[in-house]
C-alpha cells in the first residue's frame, strides 16, 4: 500500500495552481509511465502464464466422448436457448421459424425506444415498455418450459 500525499489547501502556491486549473493529478503517482509501462504488462503476462500453466499441468476433460450410436431422442440445447428452440419446433414453416428466431434480438433492441421519456425515470412510470417487458418475460418462460416437454404437450404445457 502506497503512501498518499495529502494536499495542503492553505498553501498559497497550491491555491494559485488550482486557480489556473493545474491541480488535476498534481499529487500522487502518475499513470504514465509507471502503471502503463510496468505494472499492467506484468499483470497481463502473469494472468496469461497462470492460465497456460493450469491448462498444461491440470488439463480437464469436458464431459465424455461422443457416441453416435447412443444419441438421446430429445436433443436439447442449453437452457437459455429453450424459448428460441421452442419457436423452431412449433412453427411449421422453416423460413418463418428462422425469421421469428432472428426477430427476437431485434425485438429486444426496440424495447428501450418504445417511450420517449427519461431512461433513468422510475420504470413503473413507463407503462408501455414495462408491459412489453412483462409480457415478453411470460412468453419466454412459457416457451422455455414448453421446450423440455414432448412436442405433443409443448404448446399447452400438458395442462389442457
Curated annotation (Swiss-Prot):
Localisation per UniProt entry: Plastid, Chloroplast thylakoid membrane
Pfam families listed in its UniProt record: Cytochrom_B_C
GO biological process, any: photosynthetic electron transport chain
Keywords: Chloroplast, Electron transport, Membrane, Photosynthesis, Plastid, Thylakoid, Transmembrane, Transmembrane helix, Transport
Keyword Electron transport among UniProt keywords: yes
Annotated membrane topology: Multi-pass membrane protein
Coiled-coil region list: none
Recorded GO MF terms: electron transporter, transferring electrons within cytochrome b6/f complex of photosystem II activity; electron transporter, transferring electrons within the cyclic electron transport pathway of photosynthesis activity; oxidoreductase activity
Subunit structure of this chain's protein: The 4 large subunits of the cytochrome b6-f complex are cytochrome b6, subunit IV (17 kDa polypeptide, petD), cytochrome f and the Rieske protein, while the 4 small subunits are petG, petL, petM and petN. The complex functions as a dimer.
Role according to the record: Component of the cytochrome b6-f complex, which mediates electron transfer between photosystem II (PSII) and photosystem I (PSI), cyclic electron flow around PSI, and state transitions.
Protein name: Cytochrome b6-f complex subunit 4
Organism: Welwitschia mirabilis
Gene from which this protein is expressed: petD
